[in-house]
Amino acid sequence: QAQLESELWLEKHGADLKSIHFVEVPFPEMAGALERGQVAAALMVEPLITAAGDKVRMLGDAMGAIAPQFVSTGWFASDAWVQANPDVAARFVRAILRTARWANTHHTQSAQILVRSAKLDPVIASKMTRSTYGTKLEPALLQPVVDMFSHFGVLSKPMRADEIIWTASPAVARS
């Protein structure tokens, strides 16, 4: 998805995508590759942006090329599994949303979890830009990503986001 976001940003800013050669560099190695001149630009993510400090310069927000707000992560299951396990699926969704609400309102505590689980420097964790986690999945927030995938041929045909979002029945949602 990172390359598609980059391509979309470049396209919106008038770049000729045929003149650009993309190379895969692991996220933790991007700042070094930039410093050594091995790449001209990189799509970096937090906490690596903050850790790089003034060694890198922001050219633009590739994710912003998709939409001002959109869904950037998701969890997927087959229709057959969801139909066979609707209660488990509903509990999973509730747990994810409950965690998102907690993380959005407990920045200090969630940063401490990042420090422990990702072995992140506490100073970096306190300074980095944090995402706001979605607390409900709305088709309007997923559609820009679906459209990007369609635009670049990842999907064989256009698709409506509301067709791929599972919603628990009211009885299962309350269980």
Feature names for model-found ranges:
Residues Q1, K12, K55-M58, R116, ...:
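A short linear boundary/processing microfeature
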Residues S150-S175:
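Conserved C-terminal helix/tail region of periplasmic/extracytoplasmic solute-binding proteins
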Residues F22-V23, F27-I113:
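Pocket-lining segment of extracytoplasmic ligand-binding domains
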Residues E11-P26, R36-V39, P122-I124, L155-E163:
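A local structural motif
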Residues Q83-S156:
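Secondary-structure end/capping motifs
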Residues Q3-H21, P28, Q83-D87:
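Hinge/capping helix and adjacent helix->loop/strand transition within the periplasmic-binding protein
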Residues D54-V56, S72-T73, T135-K136, A168-V172:
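Short secondary-structure transition/capping segments
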